[in-house]
Amino acid sequence: GSEMCIRDRSIQLGYGLIEMVDEQTGGPLVNRITGVRKQLSRNLGFVIPSVRVRDDMSLGANQYRLRIGQTIVGEDEVYPERKLAIPGEQSNLKLSGIDVKEPTFGIDATWIEAHKQTEAESHGYVVVEPETVLTTHVSQVITKYAGELLGQDDVQALLDNLANSAPNLVQSVVPKLIPLHSLTGILRELLAERMPISDLRRILETLANLAGKNLSVSESAEALRPGLAGLLVQQIAPLSQPLSVITLSSELEHMLIQMVRQSGEAGLMLDNALAEKMIKSINSASERASAEGQQAVMVVSPAIRKQLSSIIRHHIDDMIVLGFTELPDSRKINVIATISGENEQQN
């Protein structure tokens, strides 16, 4: 029954933010959100349904809230009359304004009066429009919950579309080898880790080859990843640039592989101290990459990829964890940190 409750996606705005959507005053928010939806639909490989924007008098004037179904998946405040100044590496001047944590990346930032923009920029701050702050947050939330936004109807629409060019493939795989609900489950699991599902032909061909193996939904998703990861890597770093990678030290990796082998179905049980150290090191490496405009990904042994990913994503929303079998051969990489579980080594 999870199909029904997911369908409603909305952004609720406090009364002070209504001007951001007012067509008369040229409020750009609705167009910007449509742009985000189209971009993410292209990246993820399915049409992301529209997001309703509506006012909500129970919210504070500057508050907004993002909902999927009944669940609140994000809320924060923006100041339409101000701009958000985000410090760079070299920013040493303290700006006067409203100090906040920026919602998408959790960085300290300051809402400054609009006329102070030039001064802020001359001190190394990046200055962002309020609409951009909100749409970036919306984009992050849709990406994070993409798996939950995909329903069986959406998958059927993707299949109908593919059937125009590959009718025999579609007929021979769904529902003969895989029922629609299982395929939906597999695609949702891929999306939950940002894996694009746009190459549906390849997905069905691979699933047809795996059909005799009796794999679970999770195992099927895992088996599909190496064939799809090239698309994801391309979205993270253009081909001309090396991919910024965080790895584990071989000692730590071997230890985790042993733990997974021993615990079997229970998955990876890390003691808190080790988990905390790892998360902290990964976080700081990732933040260093962000400061240089790169997005870092983790690359680990396929034997622990899935378990490790679910632990890490629990703490660091947008960290992508790839198995080393998933990296395209030709791809240049740049290892920016090696996590040892002791204290981190920077490269």
Label the predicted regions:
Residues 6-332, 338:
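Structured cytosolic domains appended to multi-pass membrane proteins
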Residues 1-5:
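Short, small-residue-biased leader/transition segments that mark boundaries at the very start
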Residues 339-347:
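A polyampholytic, Gly/Pro-enriched intrinsically disordered region
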